[in-house]
Amino acid sequence: MISFLRGPVAHIGLSAAVIDVGGVGMLVQATPKTLGTLRLGQESTLTTAMIVREDSMTLYGFADPDEREVFEILLTVSGIGPRLGLAVLAVLEPETIRVATSTGDGKTFTKVPGIGPKVAGRIVLELAGKLVPHGTVNGAPASPSAQWKPQVVAAMTSLGWSEKDALASVEKATADSPELISDGNVAEILRTTLRWLGQDGARTSAGRQVTARG
């Protein structure tokens, strides 16, 4: 894997730059912010990630290793490809992404063109626990446990539920789990609520069938 590139900047475009590495022009896709730090003819260093496909090999450039790490973790989300992952970094800072995933704030990701509520909710759900804000201790969520309910409700509304239904579902799903409430783990409470909704939906459907038969 090509971990970084260093050399004079030969070209700067709207979405990519060319770095002259030993006489070879390396085309690197990058965010407008990263491209804005480059100057034609000046030597620059870009942290890179190479994405290999059947018909292509593409280099993506980043300001630092932290930005690359967030990019690579974003690509583990189903439906998020390199272009959309780069679009997320074009709009949101790496730390903002870390905080949003750790607190279940799906609305933050809807600021990115091409990401709607469903995709935003999927990002939050699939990246729960994978991106930890740098300001936390021992991987604890950045927000106090006392504030978990608004965060879970926000994540559910980003998945399509109304705020009223989300709040009611959270309360019912956690009613018999005091330890879950005291821990205030947003990701775990969200998973528990979604599981409860699935079971409740099955029970409701079965009840309707019995009523219809009667």
From Swiss-Prot:
Domain of life, source organism: Bacteria
Subcellular location: Cytoplasm
GO biological process per UniProt: DNA recombination; DNA repair
Region of interest (Domain I), residue spans: 1-63
Location of region: Domain III: 144-214
Annotated stretches, region: Flexible linker: 139-143
Predominant localisation class: cytoplasm
Family: Belongs to the RuvA family.
Subunit structure: Homotetramer. Forms an RuvA(8)-RuvB(12)-Holliday junction (HJ) complex. HJ DNA is sandwiched between 2 RuvA tetramers; dsDNA enters through RuvA and exits via RuvB. An RuvB hexamer assembles on each DNA strand where it exits the tetramer. Each RuvB hexamer is contacted by two RuvA subunits (via domain III) on 2 adjacent RuvB subunits; this complex drives branch migration. In the full resolvosome a probable DNA-RuvA(4)-RuvB(12)-RuvC(2) complex forms which resolves the HJ.
Name of the protein in question: Holliday junction branch migration complex subunit RuvA
Organism: Renibacterium salmoninarum (strain ATCC 33209 / DSM 20767 / JCM 11484 / NBRC 15589 / NCIMB 2235)
